[in-house]
Amino acid sequence: MKVLNLYACLGGNRLLWDNCEVTAVELDPELARLYQERFPNDTVIVADAHQYLLDHYKEFDFIWSSPPCPTHSRARYWGFGANGKKPIYPDMKLYQEIIFLQHHCKTKYCVENVIPYYEPLIPAKKRDRHLYWTNFKLPNSLSDRHFEGISQTKNEVTKLCEFHDYDFRKYKGNQVLNKIARNLVDYEAGKTIFDTARGIINKKDTKQTSIFDEL
């Protein structure tokens, strides 16, 4: 199974994927280096993920995209005015990719982002702290792990290192460390979504069928 992992960051979503051939696209060279170190068998490409999707979407069996979330986040909106922050336009690449995939992608896909400060322009599936746009059904619960409360702790980065099973302090680039750590998808949620897309969850089992939402 060929998988495209866009805006791959450090591969939080990808950690528990197995039996697949992954191409990861990340624009930040330092994140790409650490991703390759973490997943040496993946193909890692330093490039614009938005353009890469347009050029290569037909080559994969499953596509995961996590476009940058800061311009959509409630935290950024609530922080307006603090420390001289000015309002900014939401980055519409998120919705460009959703619309493009909805109309042109024949394989399974998942677009992930934060819950925004506005009403989502395209209906999504809300799970925990994230929204997901998919062309397949998702279980009502993606993970038994709980992130809540970590961001309020004094040792936030340390707690996030423990939660994601990764030492984020390896990162020596220009991005803010705790933001990178906060934005990583829970690896159990990533596995549940991937396994669902691949059809591992048996939808003929009535116990499984009952946990699926309608598209």
Predicted regions and their residues:
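Class I S-adenosyl-L-methionine
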Residues: 25, 52-62, 69-215
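SAM cofactor-binding core of SAM-dependent methyltransferases
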Residues: 1-53, 64, 72
